[in-house]
Amino acid sequence: LHLSIVQRCASRLGLQALWVLVGLASSTLVSAAGALPTYGEMDAAGFAGSPRENYALQDFSDKYRATLDISAKDDVFRPGVINVYDKASGAALIRVQSDELVLGTDPKTGKVKTNVHELPYGEQSVLIYQDFNFDGIKDLALMDGQNSCYHGPSYQVFLGTAHGFRHSDSFTKLAQNNCGLFSVNEKARKIETMTKDGCCWHQTSTYSIRNGEPVLETQTVLDHTGGSGLPTETVSRNQNGKMTHTTSIVWEEDQQREILLSFRLAPSGKRIVLFRSGDASPVFYAAVDSKNQVGLLFPQADGEQLKYDAASHVLSFVRGDTAYRIVGDAKGAPSAMQVVVRGKTTELKLLAEPAKGSLNKVADALKAAQ
């Protein structure tokens, strides 16, 4: 009898212990499931111990609202936290923190501005609410600091769903690795990005949306680092999942570029231009077509050189087995152009229009560059 009572008591105690363990496990699961996802990096301890200001963001949605908790220091970039809430339930949905947020408020309401998106270098607000993947549900971009080009604004991107938001690594990558947030072309249903490196290297990319994700379609790189100052344009295109690349040199009008001589060939209208980019700088020859593509640029390689014979009024240069000659009169006006390939000469006619500049100006510039 005593043993039976002891067994029943032990059984009850074991059952109670089991329920306690189950309760603890259930509590842990609920807590984990309900944990607020936090994105971005910051000195949380320093932020917690510093004076802060709290702002409501401008009303941007019927379903959601947001706040900005930011350092009270009067700095351009300040530590802060953006929180997004469900309006109906009051539940916190997303938290983004950063050591470098910006405070831009509406002077009339005092609320933090939203949906300001002035590309490429203008103001961009801490929250942008727009349909990025063209599925009919608006998405969120929340500033997470100044991680894009030239210490510009960067964003964490959350795609809207029927039940809230989900973080998107692919869209976030586009909002981190370029100059600010991407632009949205709703009519073309495309996403466009831009980035640069100094004055002389620019890259623009266009993405289509497939299955809700961005897919690179075209990418154009303009590189002005060549000695002539003319940009090399490399265009990459997605051809059935494989990127193809074409490279060309592009003629651009530039106020710093001095045109020494310019004339057109007949009947194509192709422009022949001799130019330099400043006093004592090298002289370059460019053959430019109607689409401003440069078919021939000279010099490019080491050892290549333009030569002018004052006695015969001829400017010439050689590339490979081909020699090019521009023949002028005593006043420096071009009268003919010749292309000589392995001893065979082809005469190129000029359009019957006045040339701009002269061979004499080219000759003077060549002397100045020596």
Feature names for model-found ranges:
Residues 14-28:
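Bacterial N-terminal signal peptides
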Residues 30-92, 184-259, 322, 329-370:
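Acidic, small-residue rich beta-repeat scaffolds with periodic aromatic anchors
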Residues 85-88, 150-170, 206-211:
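Beta-propeller blade repeat segments, especially FG-GAP/WD-type strand-to-loop junctions
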Residues 101-111, 282-312:
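A low-complexity, Ser/Thr/Gly/Pro-enriched, surface-exposed linker/loop concept
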Residues 103-125, 173-183, 201:
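Repeat-based blade/solenoid architectures
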Residues 126-134, 183-186:
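Structural signature of eukaryotic scaffold interfaces centered on beta-propeller domains
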